[in-house]
């Protein structure tokens, strides 16, 4: 039993048992740990945990993330689930660090890395705190049992060989820019899912794609990407999220990485060069033309842009001085053909006519999440956790 206040954070839903019902994989952040300034021993030795549950509440397995998987925003400890080996049961992928302990379904445990290592400051830390030292691991595990198939040195290194200065390498020295991680399951060949990893958004960024051998669960590198050239049009184009989409409709998925798109072969497909932003949406927003489109807000060069997802040709853009921060695109009304785009510091945009919609108010459309809620074919928007 836990003695502290654990707060539910992210949840992943997947079919990990093969019984026809989904299971939940839920991350719980230890708010007592944060309130006590992330002391080396945590709060009573407890840290962030990840737990897998059946719908009836039975716990299948759980992970004590340990002292070295901590950040003040609680968003860089991630786990994803997908059926990469195509056996009808999803597996899991996550990043690990020294001292993480996996408590498997059979009652046994596996410690990741060196359990004696603790990279938290002796007197604790406050403010914008990230653990940015020590070993990192890529864990590929059985989703039903929690037993790892592979525990590998994390391929997207915090510092490359020969690099010693975090600030020089990433642009800050406290771990914010080096501690941005993404995971996914794109169909890069159009037939089988690959494992995708990425690191970095503001400046440099690194990516790798693996193919899974279903028989051995070994991971084979499909391609890698590494951009650390500040004069490159690809540099600093990442967002706080990314997407997977077949933008050119060739049957193979691309990586939609903020202001740029990476082709299924790991080469750059197109980029706007507009830099970093916070929110992006990709889809067939204009059904009257071929291919998909992207609607983004912008921070480096505010405010937003609407563009061809394949070529990055900009159809419409609003400029200004404010970091928009949020944007949304969806088919919110039958009064207008196609989708509507909306960002902070702007009014609604027709993603068919490529211009602002005269007389339409943004009241009633929030800018965080799309959802189908009331049974019709129009989308609704959802904001926060209070049901707005």
Predicted regions and their residues:
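Beta-propeller-forming repeat regions
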Residues: 1-388
